[in-house]
Amino acid sequence: TCVAALNLDDGKTVWTHEDSWGASYASPILTKIHDRDVALVLAAGESRPAHGGLLVLDPRSGKLLSRFPWRADIYESVLASTPLSISHNQVFISDCYELGGVLLNFSKDFTIQPAWKKRFFGMHMMTPQKIGNYLYGFAGRNIPDTQLKCLNLKNGEILIEDDVRWKEGQRTTGLF
């Protein structure tokens, strides 16, 4: 099972969605796209070749409304950054291994088109934070390739890149 909906009162399964992409580390979210309730699932289980991406499901039935492939061609890659609802028709998803981040535009029939792609704004185990028209997050997989970055949502331009250095046993320099 890739994802399942459970009844909050008794814990029984309401529906399951089977998909070759499989389950991932990313938490599904509920949001609205064009005023319709949807569940966004970033799916990427164990598979050779590696495959996965964004599944858009009806949260009442589990029916697939749309899908967008977005996963590196590396077996060990994971999708762990939770999808981020940006507006009534935009969602940001991320892969840190090869692809980076992508802002997705949704039409009313749930056709998905990338607004922009940014290779070096790939989140690994975190979801970026949206503040105004900007995303802030630690892009990269681990030290030493991780940087604090700020990205303009309108055009995908990276505005800030800070090589935050970690010191063993001390606070992060430059942040606190």
Q: Model segments located where?
A:
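Noncatalytic, solvent-exposed loop/strand surfaces
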Residues: 1-176
